[in-house]
């Protein structure tokens, strides 16, 4: 596949059920042909492959030598539980702490609101997350990690695709193309959002229980992310942040230019989000 099709990476199914020694030997053999990106369908923080907690091995060490990234299944299921009212936004902090306790800052996981398994077997993001589908898309893209966009999400796909048969996607007029373009351009271009960068700071913002806010900052450039999981508008937290008050802010989705004081005076809409970045 590397020699003839020039593939640049592999997504390896239930990688943790294969002996890690195999992957550790396979990776340098592939890299000798061409540097590849290796993604493991596995999460060392959450049971994968249909295993129970008792059967699960969290010490597969797939990210030591063989793989660049694993799935972030623990966060995925946490977001589902949040939408169901079975978890609190503060539980995200516990997840991030567990991730950092296990891995150095250079390691990052893949986060998502849908993928081929989830869409077909568990339901679309609109079935599972309801009005939080887009706020949680913002969250999975801008928390530390690598975001995944599944087929049809930019077209607001709202049906379960057949798993083993051809099932064409109705692309419509790509209603969410602008949303995902702005989101991923920010992710790609902003220095504070780079994957596995130990120089990027993460600051959690205090606020009401239904608001999850954080700042990511590097060398004076910052991104503010605010997620409102409630049915009521919420005010922005007023605490001191890493943002230089002399710098103006740019609302990534509305295009507004604001002062820090103006930004703090705004609310986050019900089941909504706001993403601000410092102006250059």
Predicted segments with their positions:
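Aromatic/acidic polysaccharide-binding cleft in carbohydrate-active enzymes
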Residues: 107-174
């Amino acid at each position: 596949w590397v020699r003839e099709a020039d593939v640049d990476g592999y997504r390896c199914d239930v990688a943790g059920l294969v002996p890690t020694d195999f992957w550790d030997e396979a990776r340098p053999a592939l890299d000798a042909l061409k540097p590849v990106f290796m993604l493991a369908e596995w999460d060392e923080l959450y049971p994968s492959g249909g295993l129970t907690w008792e059967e699960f091995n969290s010490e597969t060490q797939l990210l030591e030598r063989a793989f660049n990234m694993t799935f972030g299944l623990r966060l995925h299921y946490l977001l589902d539980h949040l939408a169901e009212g079975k978890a609190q936004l503060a539980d995200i902090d516990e997840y991030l702490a567990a991730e950092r306790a296990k891995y150095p800052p250079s390691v990052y996981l893949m986060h998502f609101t849908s993928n081929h398994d989830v869409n077909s077997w568990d339901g679309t993001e609109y079935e599972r997350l309801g009005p939080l589908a887009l706020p949680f898309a913002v969250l999975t893209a801008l928390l530390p990690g690598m975001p995944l966009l599944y087929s049809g999400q930019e077209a607001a796909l709202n049906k379960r695709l057949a798993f083993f048969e051809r099932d064409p996607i109705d692309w419509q007029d790509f209603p969410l193309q602008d949303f995902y373009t702005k989101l991923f351009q920010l992710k790609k271009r902003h220095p504070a959002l780079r994957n596995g960068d130990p120089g990027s700071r993460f600051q959690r913002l205090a606020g009401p229980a239904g608001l999850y806010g954080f700042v990511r900052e590097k060398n004076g450039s910052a991104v503010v992310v605010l997620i409102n999981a409630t049915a009521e508008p919420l005010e922005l937290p007023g605490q001191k942040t890493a943002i230089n008050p002399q710098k103006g802010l740019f609302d990534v989705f509305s295009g507004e230019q604001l002062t820090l004081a103006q930004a703090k005076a705004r609310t986050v809409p019900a089941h909504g989000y706001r993403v601000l970045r410092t102006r250059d």
